[in-house]
């Protein structure tokens, strides 16, 4: 899952080997939530990308556009009579990391104050888990890691959401997530307490994600 690190940008399909498919998560839709995208991608919206390449691409995507500066207000929706009602996919569209903390993120009434990060893996690995809990040390590929916002950085919980990463939020009522720009911190890879990387992309010293 990913988001653009600018206000708006076309997806750079030619930058990386293979043919990509980009879909947008639509909480309001009843059925397959992953809807085809057309035109420019928007800030703070979560997207899904797949690539038909048989080997892992080594190139870097380049997004051009105006940077997001200042606080962000992100709409969270809760649509009745749809599947996965209240499940919203939000992206970090800043060029710095968002701390998983109550100082950095203010949740609306009705929102679960927990950030869900998708662990390294494929959709097929997620499907085969079929929503089951994993009662073992470590995290399985295709599993979500739930991080309570008041526990970010404690024990084995990561403390930040790097630029371009997307994360799931659950809410029982529509409202607005507020992100405090002054609390942003440096990008790093998202790791467990033991240093093991737990999400799909890592950030290098030049703020590139791969």
Question: Residue locations for each model-derived region?
Answer:
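Extended terminal and domain-junction accessory segments
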Residues: 180-210
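N-terminal exported-region signature
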Residues: 1-184, 191
